Every structure is written in C-alpha cells, then in structure tokens.
C-alpha cells in the first residue's frame, strides 16, 4: 500500500492542511509474493518527504528505535507540527494469507533459511533479552507478565467461543447513523 494513490493523496492533504497524523508504514519487504524492490521504485520514506512530511526510516524489529520515532512523531502532531511518516523496516514471517501454500503449491517465493534468519530477529524476544541483560527487568517477572497475558487471551477466546451466534436480523442495525426525524418526509415532498 505504500505505493498506492490513496497514500499519495492522503500525504498531500495532511501536509497541505497540517493535520496531526502519524503514518506508520510496516515495510515487510514484499508486495504480496513479490519482493518490494521489484515493484517499488526508490525509497518509501521519500514519498512522504516529497509532500514535505517529515519522515524517518527505522529498524522495525528494534522496539526502542520504533518507540523513539513514534514519540517524536506524536509530539510533533500534538504540538501542531503536522504529519509525520515512519517507515519501519521488518520482515513478514508468516505468509501473505492463510491459504498461501495451497495457492502457490511448491512455488515458494522465499526459502526457509531466509525465514528462519528473520525469525531469530523477533522484536519481542530481542527486547526481552535487552531488558533482562540490562537489569531493567527480571526474567521471572517477564515470565509472570507473559503468563498473565496468555491467560487473558485464553479467557477472551473461551468467552467468545461460548457466546451465542449473532442474530442475522441485527446485521445491519449498527451500520448507519439513525436518520434525522422527518428526513424521509422531506425527500418525498421534494
């Protein structure tokens, strides 16, 4: 999507109007099954710069680097400095969609060694290691936090699975705002 006309229009308007928007491009190196370099000319962050939107490129697998860039962009937006663009370079470990192997068969577009090399750069594991090695947090404390999160996720999944299916008759009830009183009457009189 970082090459789409919609993004270009949005960057233009946000810059023109000085909107407090923070754009984050998760550049995973692919456009579906094609390496991004084969379908995208130039640097993605330069697209934002072309519209005078401050842009930074960060290692999307470095939690601290992303946090700092986001903090600066958020501060700029809150201070009335207009939009910012963050390109977080990372890698897509999972496929583009669940049925990818069925659709592609053996026609894989990346090899297992490449995927495994990037798996070793998991941002959560790297940040955890940094927290423990710096003494900022203990492994036991982080294990307890992770266990608590996993429990909450399991509880939420169990709650959802135990719930009743939605009533199909209600499917469209919250899609539109209520019509103002008398609006249909005004249309018929026109």
Predicted regions span which residues?
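Glycine-rich ThDP/TPP pyrophosphate-binding loop and its adjacent helix/strand module
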Residues: 4-155, 159-162
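C-terminal intrinsically disordered, low-complexity extensions immediately downstream
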Residues: 155-190
